[in-house]
């Protein structure tokens, strides 16, 4: 009977020892395995469709118009800009009008005769644009650049001073087309349109 009790005590001690070893391995031998957490479900964003916006987050025409007419607090001037050509521009131009991408598309849809003059000179251009980067040069309305501008405008309009003349460069942060438009206004053209949004707005509208 005493021998049987001794065996029971030995068995209990072995059981406790194994349990302690297993517990020690769980605590110090490495991290205990936790149940895998479920990955968060992706949130689906609605595809923009209002106002002509394309899939992928491209702005619609209404949004583009707001961007193109943004007021940066820069006063409009009748004088040629002689500072940095890449910076915020006025939201208007004396003697001319700001035309938006929506307005450009309306002109095309109604097939209104007009002349587009590219004052940027980048590889990406608006369709049928006349090269005129040099029109952006600062100076005065009596300098040789103005004389040359008068000759070019006479040629592309065939002498019709009421033909819509559209000047563009890169974006509302580009003064080059502003200067070119001022030269046309000073030359006596009555329908000068400054496409302030430029080639960047044109591309954002999905145009090529």
Regions inferred by a protein language model and the residue ranges of each:
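Pro/Ala/Gly-rich low-complexity, hydrophilic intrinsically disordered segments
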Residues: 66, 205-208
């Amino acid at each position: 009977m005493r021998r049987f009790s001794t065996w029971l005590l030995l068995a209990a001690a072995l059981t406790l020892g194994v349990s302690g070893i297993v517990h020690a391995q769980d605590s110090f031998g490495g991290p205990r395995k936790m149940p895998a957490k479920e990955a968060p479900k992706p949130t689906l964003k609605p595809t923009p469709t209002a106002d002509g916006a394309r899939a992928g987050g491209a702005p619609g025409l209404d949004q583009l118009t707001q961007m193109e007419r943004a007021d940066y607090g820069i006063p409009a001037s009748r004088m040629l800009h002689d500072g940095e050509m890449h910076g915020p521009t006025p939201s208007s131009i004396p003697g001319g009008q700001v035309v938006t991408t929506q307005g450009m598309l309306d002109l095309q849809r109604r097939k209104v005769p007009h002349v587009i003059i590219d004052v940027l000179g980048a590889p990406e251009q608006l369709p049928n644009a006349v090269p005129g980067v040099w029109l952006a040069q600062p100076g005065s309305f009596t300098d040789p650049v103005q004389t040359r501008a008068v000759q070019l405008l006479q040629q592309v309009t065939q002498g019709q001073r009421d033909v819509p003349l559209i000047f563009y460069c890169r974006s509302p942060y580009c003064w080059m087309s502003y200067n070119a438009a001022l030269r046309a206004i000073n030359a006596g053209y009555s329908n000068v349109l400054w496409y302030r949004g430029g080639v960047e707005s044109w591309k954002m509208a999905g145009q090529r």
